[in-house]
Amino acid sequence: MRGAIAIFGDVHGNLIALETFVAATRGRVSGYVNLGDTVGYGPWPDACVARVRALCGTAKGMIEGNHERLHLGADDLARQTPLVQRFYAHAPSRCRDLTPITGLPLLFDLTRYRCQHAAPEPPARRRYLVGHSHRQGPDPRRPDIIHVGSIGQCRSAINRVEWAEMDLASHDITLHSIPYPVDALMDALRAHHYPAECIDYYARKPRR
């Protein structure tokens, strides 16, 4: 495979943000690796899983995140925050078909980097590309770990879509951040009758 690979994660059922990312990378990258948490929160989990599977080609390029584990019952929803439980109590946040997210790998080795959902504990002597934090950039305490950002729920600016790209010739990592219409997502949450506190989660986040 030549060219560049897009490494992305934390779509969180946000099809609008995912399609913004696809449009930005189409024709520029030759492949995709997904770092997990395709599901959870947003109203389009099944559509997002199908889109990500199509991008990655096979399930090998999709990694299990903690929200896949919540969907599968491998992690206990009762131990999550009340807000997470409110999202999960609302039917559109749930996958109807669990088959595509069952048995996903926990990691994917891409040249000199190991791709996995969250930063490893304890650290290992290698380089990592991770999601989970919903933030982007090198880890301030561990520069061997790069956080690629979040497609569907960026913490630093809720109206941004963030991901990383790796040049397969040089192995250089480039970080990308672009805006998307988050108000359209909130309109969809209202149309799907999400509780007010779920919509407020997006509304009160900073933008740029």
Task: Locate each region found by the language model.
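N-terminal active-site segment of His-dependent metallophosphoesterases
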Residues: 1-58, 208
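Short, glycine/charged-enriched secondary-structure capping and boundary segments
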Residues: 20-23, 47-50, 76-79, 142-144, ...
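Active-site environment of divalent metal-dependent phosphoester hydrolases
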Residues: 12-17, 40-43, 67-72, 121, ...
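Active-site neighborhood of phospho(di)ester-bond hydrolases with catalytic His/Asp-centered motifs
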Residues: 7-9, 32-37, 61-66, 115-116, ...
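Beta-strand-turn-beta hairpins that frame and shape the catalytic cleft
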Residues: 1-6, 108-114, 142-144, 171
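Acidic, His/Gly-rich catalytic cores of divalent-metal-dependent hydrolytic chemistry
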Residues: 140-208
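Short active-site oxyanion
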Residues: 4-5, 59-60, 125-127, 172-173
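Active-site neighborhood of divalent metal-dependent phosphoester bond hydrolases
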Residues: 51-111, 115-116, 122-124
